[in-house]
A protein has these predicted regions:
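Active-site loop-to-helix "anion-binding N-cap" substructures in soluble metabolic enzymes
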Residues: 1-102
Length: 102
């Protein structure tokens, strides 16, 4: 059987303002100073909170993702975020095709 990484992911939907997101990210980072080998922890906050959460989980073993991504690289797509934009904000994952977005 191939070695697989267990991915534990979560998001808080459209909840928490920036201050609440910062507090939650701080709590997550303190609660997870390390994770076992073969496990990856991922958090996907709302887009407006990505940079705040990124700054607070940088030193923790927590990956950052987005709740949605738009397929075009650039353009007049109000309210959307491209892969490059999310990557530049520190995201390494993204939820794609969630039933709430279809």
């Amino acid at each position: 059987m191939p070695n697989r990484t267990l991915l534990i992911a979560g998001n808080w939907k459209m909840n928490n303002d920036v201050a609440e997101a910062a507090k939650l990210a701080d709590e997550l980072a303190q609660a997870l100073p390390e994770v076992p080998a073969g496990v990856e922890v991922l958090v996907c906050p709302p887009t407006i909170d990505i940079t705040t959460v990124h700054d607070r989980i940088q030193a923790a073993p927590i990956a950052l993702g987005a709740q949605n991504v738009y397929w075009e690289a650039k353009g007049a797509f109000t309210g959307e975020s491209s892969c490059d934009m999310l990557k530049s904000a520190g995201c390494t994952y993204c939820i794609i095709g969630h039933s709430e977005r279809r």
